[in-house]
């Protein structure tokens, strides 16, 4: 069966390549449709398959001395499921792009970049060696830069793209550490060889954690994720749902068999994910930009996925990746539809009453927010609740349970706040124009993703989980803890926004400065520290640091020596005939004396 999986997956990849290089718009759109049809076939095969073996496609690429660089693909359950989800979500985003970017003169190039973005991610997911993973890893990095800076005339877009590259370069150091250690120690880059080792050095695992933290925007390397909202909305949708940001989590899932055998590294991953999910949820509470609220929700969910890996449940982390892709892509597309209809207005405080102007988009936005909160029987419920239950029974650290539950309640709070300010209430704009929802490329993708957000949890939990995750026997209070804190957070948020709405004037609360300023991290790291170093460099110049020896030995020293030599040559040329004759006589006498002596 998995041989068929491999053929179908590679066929889907071929379809994507075909429309990437198509020059005629009709053939381009037709190829996108074929890609969507192929996903339906892949999903059908997934539902019928209950096998767990892996298929390896391997051949020699380059031979250097005694070492052969192999190209090999790994088609296991993770790869096949991600192919289905990634292709399905990207197909809908591409169709949405035809609506959102219809006035862009380079829309064909834009859609091809989106396709290349997905292909790089699929290469990363299906890689069976660190070298192939590096190709996909750098591929999603460069494509994210090109897409975030798509509107290159905007300075904020260019700054955000550079910020994404710089922060990911820090994570790339971890990946290079993995490559070097594996080659020196094992002489091979294959995952199979790494899994077979009895002991893996902590240095290697620290590289895994650093690489994952950079790519998945964990705490400390997170500022690039909300800044990336400067790109077009389809880019944000694809970036946050099924490509770049989940690459780091997927790396942790791939190496989870090794990580779970090292308790110190496992605790580090657990702690990093817990702090990220709480910090991002706190920051999302005070954001007023619609896309940034959704972006911080992504960072919070990524932290929850990392926490699941640290808690010893990588299967649940992967399940949450799949569920999260559906409703997060839909949330961004709904946000883009609202922003597009409101003439690029992104401040939620200026919105309101959008249900009357765009009812279909508003309903989809509500479904996506409910799935994000973990409302029972939607997609998010089937992945978030098991993660929280696993955290409740793990023996790593008890305080993490409380932090994750607080973050879950905050998720409900900022989701309700976002719904209230955008869809609910009355319009706070001077004139609210009706939004045209008759475009098939707008409504079709939203409806498909809305249906997926409703039924995907049932499908995936039924066909994937029984063979991978054992059922948990917990007290009723622990089973209902996630639902309870979600309900409490939503009710508190609803009460607060109603209270603030009734107040004639609202005094600025100093405590909100921390959330609104993203914990002051960008202010400290991007402004304060560089300014301090610049001032120190101006105060303590190189001559103070080394007393001028460096400058004297190189620029001034070399120049001074050449000047002395040149002066000696010039002084010898005095244009006096008598001196020239005297020198000639002296040299002649010297030569004659030497010849006589010999």
Swiss-Prot record:
Belongs to the complex I subunit 5 family. GO terms for cellular component: mitochondrial inner membrane. Pfam families: NADH5_C (PF06455), Proton_antipo_M (PF00361), Proton_antipo_N (PF00662). Disulfide bonds: none annotated. It comes from the Eukaryota. The keyword Magnesium does not apply. The keyword RNA-binding does not apply. Its EC number is 7.1.1.2. It comes from Branchiostoma lanceolatum. NCBIfam families: NDH_I_L. The gene is ND5. GO terms for biological process: ATP synthesis coupled electron transport; electron transport coupled proton transport. PANTHER family: NADH-UBIQUINONE OXIDOREDUCTASE CHAIN 5. The chain crosses the membrane at residues 1-21, 28-48, 81-101, 115-135, 171-191, 193-213, 233-253, 265-285, 293-312, 323-343, 362-382, 399-421, 454-474, 480-500, 509-529, 576-596. It is found in: Mitochondrion inner membrane. It catalyses: a ubiquinone + NADH + 5 H(+)(in) = a ubiquinol + NAD(+) + 4 H(+)(out). GO terms for molecular function: NADH dehydrogenase (ubiquinone) activity. Its main location: mitochondrion. It is an enzyme of class 7 (translocase). This is NADH-ubiquinone oxidoreductase chain 5. Keywords: Electron transport, Membrane, Mitochondrion, Mitochondrion inner membrane, NAD, Respiratory chain, Translocase, Transmembrane, Transmembrane helix, Transport, Ubiquinone. It is a multi-pass membrane protein. Core subunit of the mitochondrial membrane respiratory chain NADH dehydrogenase (Complex I) that is believed to belong to the minimal assembly required for catalysis. Complex I functions in the transfer of electrons from NADH to the respiratory chain. The immediate electron acceptor for the enzyme is believed to be ubiquinone.
